[in-house]
Amino acid sequence: MAARAGFQSVAPSGGAGASGGAGVAAALGPGGTPGPPVRMGPAPGQGLYRSPMPGAAYPRPGMLPGSRMTPQGPSMGPPGYGGNPSVRPGLAQSGMDQSRKRPAPQQIQQVQQQAVQNRNHNAKKKKMADKILPQRIRELVPESQAYMDLLAFERKLDQTIMRKRLDIQEALKRPIKQKRKLRIFISNTFNPAKSDAEDGEGTVASWELRVEGRLLEDAALSKYDATKQKRKFSSFFKSLVIELDKDLYGPDNHLVEWHRTATTQETDGFQVKRPGDVNVRCTVLLMLDYQPPQFKLDPRLARLLGIHTQTRPVIIQALWQYIKTHKLQDPHEREFVLCDKYLQQIFESQRMKFSEIPQRLHALLMPPEPIIINHVISVDPNDQKKTACYDIDVEVDDTLKTQMNSFLLSTASQQEIATLDNKIHETIETINQLKTQREFMLSFARDPQGFINDWLQSQCRDLKTMTDVVGNPEEERRAEFYFQPWAQEAVCRYFYSKVQQRRQELEQALGIRNT
């Protein structure tokens, strides 16, 4: 009958094959269809079949060794008594819960390796909360309160340092300048004419003009900072023009110019040499290289704002302060400014938008005026050692800016802090492990028998979780477990799926299609 129904014959195991075959045959009706449920049990005169506990290397009864069952037949719903059925060994895969299959030892090893990797990954993500001692430890060790106080102080210190770092980063976005005195030295030398009687050749009289300069040392700066801040004289200027007497040197040779370019090499001074044996009046024009660029204001706007030369953002900020102080903002349309009589004269408008201010200011801003120095080049031998000195104000980068940058870029302290944090985390982990061991030993000392029982139950639950096995093997190995109501319906479903599979194979072989 089994061959007629299309089932594969399975070798019986021990004495259970006869009783199992009798129970299966009784469960089928005429034509291979499921018949009325019957009670499964051992054949008369035979004892109950007790299978050993299945393990990783022991297949369940009814399953071919090394084979995996594939879903067969149409999908079936759960038994009538509700819930997902726990189908017994030997049934088709379509009704078998995947979680009931015991994983191979390789799978268990992979799960354990994954757990170790997760622990290592989580260990890298150490947070401030990992430094906190549990309340139980603080109760056991009162001295730990000193550590908690230090931890709270460290938290406040970290917040203060972080706030200061943010303030420094914001400050570095703005130009940090300080005013210094640049002393300019202007001197000249005269070389009189020399005649050579033997060769009949000589040299004409000439003079040489030198323009040099250096920053005056600030008493507040240390010697190291002063050396580090040394700059070339030409780095302070955008251009330098020396205008000589036009009557003496003509319209094509009376100007000596130097302009900064992208490839300019910085120098400590400038030299000009020309022939001549008379005093020469010259004008030195120095154009400072402002960083960021500065502009000279229109005289009317300069009187109104009290600013002569300044950067564009400072000029706009001063104008906004004037508008806010005199309440010139339109009360109904806040994006407009109501010009007073002074602003009307400057901007030639009674009302303008805030967005128009930069454009209107463009026509009122001019390049800054150059520094003009008048000097007389003397050819008198008595004036050769005289040097004219002029002090001008220049803006240089504040030394504090360099210190700010070095503070933000410094990583030595961060590495040391990270090393100490790792030591603290390791110490806290050791303390927590010792706390767990202490509680373990205390529980065992109070009630050894109850503790061992609870511990075994806990280990059993952990083993099931690690091996991903559902069920109770101790109950499943007893025959009484299979006399429950679900067994009859599970057997019927198994054979019904087998019949449907065989029917589909026959229809496919005969070319019959159900319509």
Curated annotation (Swiss-Prot):
Identify the taxonomic lineage of the organism of origin: Eukaryota, Metazoa, Chordata, Craniata, Vertebrata
Question: A Gene Ontology CC term for this entry?
Answer: SWI/SNF complex
Coiled-coil segments:
412-440
**Compositional bias ranges of the Gly residues kind:** 14-23
Q: What is known about what this protein does? A: Involved in transcriptional activation and repression of select genes by chromatin remodeling (alteration of DNA-nucleosome topology). Component of SWI/SNF chromatin remodeling complexes that carry out key enzymatic activities, changing chromatin structure by altering DNA-histone contacts within a nucleosome in an ATP-dependent manner. Belongs to the neural progenitors-specific chromatin remodeling complex (npBAF complex) and the neuron-specific chromatin remodeling complex (nBAF complex).
Name the predominant localization: nucleus
Q: Family assignment?
A: Belongs to the SMARCD family.
Provide the species name.
Answer: Mus musculus
* Tissue expression: Ubiquitous.
Q: Where is the signal peptide?
A: none
At the top level, the lineage of the source is: Eukaryota
- Gene Ontology MF: a single term: signaling receptor binding
This one is known as: SWI/SNF-related matrix-associated actin-dependent regulator of chromatin subfamily D member 1
Cross-link Glycyl lysine isopeptide (Lys-Gly) (interchain with G-Cter in SUMO2), where in sequence:
101
Chain spans, region Necessary for GR/NR3C1-mediated remodeling and transcription from chromatin? 180-515
Q: Which positions carry N6-acetyllysine?
A: 223
Gene symbol of the encoding locus: Smarcd1
